[in-house]
Amino acid sequence: MYKETDVGFTIVWFSCVYSGAQGNPIIAIVPTFIFLLLHFSIVTDHLKQEIQLIIISIILGLVVDSSFSLLGFVKYNGTLDFAPNLAPLWIICMWAGFTAQINHVMKFLIGKYLLICFYGLLAPLAYIAGEGIGAAIVKDTYLSYGFISIAWSISLLSLFKISEYLMSK
C-alpha cells in the first residue's frame, strides 16, 4: 500500500504543479479526487480520522499558503481573480494529497518530532521545483525560504500531532 500511496501522491504533486503552471484547476482536481478515493477505499479501518485529518490539513494549507502570498513571499499562478492572495485550488489539492501519506508512507516519522521538523525545513525544495515548472514565483528568496521552512516545520509537526490524536480515538 505504501508504494501505491507514494506513486499516487507523486502523480498528484506533478498534476497540481502543472495545473498551477497552466492556470487550469481541473488538472489538479481530477487526479487528487481519484487519489483520495483510492486512499479512502484502503483506509477503511480509520476512514473517519483520515477524512478529519485531510479536512484540517486543507484548512491549514489554505491559511499557510495564503499567508505566504499575503506577505509577498510567493506569487502563485492559477489564483482566483477576485482573491489573488488566496492559495489556489492546486495548492489545496496538494495539501490534501500530501496529508494522505502521513499515516502510511510517512508513518516512520510518527513520534520523531525533531525529524518531522527537519523535513519541514526542506519544504523550500518543493517550492523551488514548483517555481521551475512555472507554478509560482518565490520573492525575496532568503527571507521567503526561511519563512517557508519555519512555517512548514510547524505545520508538519502540527499535522503529525493532530494525526496521533485522531488515530488514538
What are these regions (language model features)?
Residues M1-K169:
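Aromatic-rich, lipid-facing transmembrane alpha helices and their immediate juxtamembrane interface loops
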